[in-house]
Amino acid sequence: MTSDRFFRLDAGYQQYDWGKIGSSSAVAKFAAHSDPSVKIDETKPYAELWMGTHSKLPSVNHETKATLNDILAKNSQELIGEDVINKFKSTNELPFLFKVLSIEKVLSIQAHPDKELGKKLHMEDPKNYPDDNHKPEMAVAITEFEGFCGFKPLEEIADELETIPEFRDVVGDEVANEFIQNYKTGVENSSSACANNKKLLQKVFEKVMTAPCDILEKNADGMAKRANENPSSFKSSDLPELVVRLNRQFPKDVGLFCGCLMLNHCKLQPGQALFLEAKDPHAYICGDIIECMAASDNVVRAGFTPKFKDVKNLVEMLTYRYDPVEKQVMSAEEFPRAGGDGATIMYNPPIAEFSVLETTFKNKTGKATVEGLKGPSIVITTAGEGYISADGQKLKAEPGFVFFIGANVPVELETTDKDFTTYRAFVEA
C-alpha cells in the first residue's frame, strides 16, 4: 500500500567547485546510494544535496517522479496543514530548504539579508538577488567541521592590529589607532558604548573591504609567507596554518583579512550546531553538515569567491555584533513529543521557518516514536539502517534515503543497526 502522506523523495545535488571530490563527499555517497543511476565521478566535486521545493532544484517522488511542489498543491490542506499555509501563504512550497553540504574548499565569506533588505535588494537587482526573502540558516555537523562565524571579540581584533603589521597596513594607521584607543570591553548590548564599538568595527571592516588591490595583495602575500616560514611570529597558534591553507585555495584574497583575522574560527564536533542569523558574516571552511535555511537564495558576498562581491551593501547591512566563538554554538534540547528507545533532540533556532530533529539509537535494537507534527517535514538518514513507519506503511531507511511526512502523521523509527541516525526538518505554525 502506498501513502499520500508518507513517501520517499529523490533529492537533487549541486556540483559547486568547493565540494568534496568523488566518493569522499557525503553528498555523492548519499545521492548514489539512494539512486543507483547516479554514478560517482571521482574527479568531480559534489557539494550540496537539496531537499525541498525550491524552484532551482525541487525534490521528486521516488516512485512517480512528480515534483514535491505538484504533490503539495494537489493536497495542501492535508500535507502542509491549514495553520502553516495561513502563516507562510503558500500551498505548494515549504518555507524551509533542507540540505547536506560536503565542503572541501572554503565557501565565500557572506551574509544574508533580513526580510526588509531582501525585498529592497530583489527590487533593485533581481539578477544577483533572485527572491525577496530572508535567509537565516542553521548548520549541524555530521563530521568534524570548521567555519567562520560572526566577528571576533574586539580585544582580539585590536591585538591583531597591533601585532600583525600586514593587517595594520591594509587598515591604515589612522583607523587602526582609532579602533585600538577607543573600543570598550564589558559594555551592555543596548548601551551607547556598544553602538560606538560597532561603528569602530564597521570602519575597520570597510577599510579592509575597500583597500586598493595592490596594497591588499602585497600584504596578503607577505602575511601568508610569514605564516608559512615563521608561524611563531603570530600570537594565535592556529592562525598561521589557517592563513596558509586558505591562501592556497584563494591566493592573496581579501578573505585572509576579513575572514581569518576578523571572524571567529569555529570548530564543531558531530552533533554540534551553529545558527547564523541574517546580517551576520560567516563562511564554511571544511567538513560535512546538515543545513536548514529559510527558502531563499540571496547571498551578499565579501571574500574567497570569484563571484559578484557587493561590498557597499555588505558594509552597510551587517549587524557588527561581536561575540566569543562559544556564543555562536547552539545547543539542542530533548524533544518532549518523542518516546521509545531512541534519543530524539531538537535544534530549535529563534525563527519561524524551521526546526530540526535528530534521532539516534544507543543500542542495536529498538523503536522510537514521534507524535504527529503540526506541519510538513523532510527526513534524511545519514548513518546506519532501519525502517520508518507512518500512515500505514513501513519503508526501508538507509544512508541518503530521503522521505516526506505530511502534517499530523505519527512516525515510528526502528533500528536494525546501532548507528541508525536520522535528521528531520519541520515547520509548525
Curated annotation (Swiss-Prot):
Function: Involved in the synthesis of the GDP-mannose and dolichol-phosphate-mannose required for a number of critical mannosyl transfer reactions.
This protein's record includes keyword Kinase: no
Cofactor(s) this protein cannot do without: Zn(2+)
Domain of life: Eukaryota
Primary location class: cytoplasm
SUPFAM superfamilies, sorted: RmlC-like cupins
Cofactor note: Binds 1 zinc ion per subunit.
Official protein name in the record: Mannose-6-phosphate isomerase
Positions annotated as active site in the UniProt record: R301
Protein's UniProt keywords contain Zinc: yes
A biological process from GO: GDP-mannose biosynthetic process
GO terms assigned for molecular function: mannose-6-phosphate isomerase activity; zinc ion binding
Enzyme category, top tier: isomerase
Source taxonomy: Eukaryota, Fungi, Dikarya, Ascomycota, Saccharomycotina
UniProt keywords, alphabetically: Cytoplasm, Isomerase, Metal-binding, Zinc
Organism expressing this protein natively: Candida glabrata (strain ATCC 2001 / BCRC 20586 / JCM 3761 / NBRC 0622 / NRRL Y-65 / CBS 138)
Record's catalysed reaction(s): D-mannose 6-phosphate = D-fructose 6-phosphate
Pathway in which this enzyme or protein is active: Nucleotide-sugar biosynthesis; GDP-alpha-D-mannose biosynthesis; alpha-D-mannose 1-phosphate from D-fructose 6-phosphate: step 1/2
Subcellular location: Cytoplasm
